[in-house]
C-alpha cells in the first residue's frame, strides 16, 4: 500500500508520541516470521502494555528524532520490528527474548534504555529486572523472614536458659 505524505506524517507523529512515553525500546529482525506468528506476538504485547510496530526505516528514523532513543537512528538497517515498553523497562525485552526462544529466525538486534545502547547480554539483564509488584513481594518476604528469624532465635535462647 502506497502512503501519501499526510499518512507518513501521521505515522511519524504517532511513533514519536509512543517513543516519548515509553521507558525503553527494543528492535528485532522479523524476516522469515509469518504474519500469523507476528500477530500472536502483538496479542501478547498488548496484554503486557507493549507497543509493537513494523515500520519503514526512514519513518522510524524521523519519528525517533528529538527523543531519548535518537541513538538508534544510526544503527537501523534492514527489516525492523520495534517494541516500546510502556510500564516496565524490561517488559518488551522479556517478551522478545521469550519469543526468540520459540522462533529461531527472530533476531533481536538492539535495545535502548536510559539513553544507552544495550548489547544482547544487557538486554537479557534488562529482561530479568523484576517488575514493581515482584520487587514489593520479594521485599515483604524478606521482611517476614527477618522478623521470623529473630523470633525463632529468641525462642531458642529462652529454651537454652
Curated annotation (Swiss-Prot):
UniProt record similarity statement: Belongs to the universal ribosomal protein uL10 family.
GO biological process, one term: translation
Subunit structure: Part of the ribosomal stalk of the 50S ribosomal subunit. The N-terminus interacts with L11 and the large rRNA to form the base of the stalk. The C-terminus forms an elongated spine to which L12 dimers bind in a sequential fashion forming a multimeric L10(L12)X complex.
Protein name, as recorded: Large ribosomal subunit protein uL10
Lineage of the organism: Bacteria, Pseudomonadati, Pseudomonadota, Gammaproteobacteria, Enterobacterales
InterPro entries from the UniProt entry: Ribosomal_uL10, Ribosomal_uL10-like_sf, Ribosomal_uL10_bac, Ribosomal_uL10_bac_type
GO molecular function (one): large ribosomal subunit rRNA binding
UniProt KW Repressor keyword: no
Keywords: Ribonucleoprotein, Ribosomal protein, RNA-binding, rRNA-binding
Keyword S-adenosyl-L-methionine among record annotations: no
GO cellular-component term (any): ribosome
Role, per record: Forms part of the ribosomal stalk, playing a central role in the interaction of the ribosome with GTP-bound translation factors.
Amino acid at each position: 500500500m502506497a502512503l501519501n505524505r499526510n499518512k507518513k506524517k501521521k505515522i511519524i507523529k504517532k511513533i514519536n508520541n509512543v517513543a516519548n512515553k515509553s521507558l525503553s525500546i527494543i528492535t528485532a529482525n522479523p524476516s522469515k516470521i509469518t504474519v500469523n506468528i507476528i500477530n500472536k506476538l502483538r496479542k501478547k504485547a498488548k496484554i503486557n502494555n507493549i507497543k509493537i510496530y513494523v515500520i519503514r526505516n526512514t519513518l522510524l528514523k524521523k519519528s525517533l528524532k528529538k527523543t531519548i532513543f535518537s541513538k538508534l537512528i544510526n544503527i537501523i538497517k534492514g527489516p525492523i520490528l520495534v517494541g516500546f515498553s510502556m510500564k516496565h523497562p524490561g517488559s518488551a525485552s522479556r517478551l522478545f527474548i521469550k519469543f526468540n526462544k520459540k522462533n529461531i529466525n527472530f533476531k533481536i538486534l538492539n535495545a535502548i534504555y536510559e539513553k544507552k545502547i544495550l548489547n544482547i547480554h544487557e538486554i537479557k539483564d534488562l529482561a530479568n529486572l523484576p517488575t514493581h509488584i515482584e520487587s514489593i513481594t520479594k521485599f515483604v518476604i524478606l521482611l517476614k523472614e527477618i522478623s521470623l528469624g529473630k523470633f525463632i532465635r529468641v525462642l531458642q535462647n529462652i529454651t537454652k536458659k
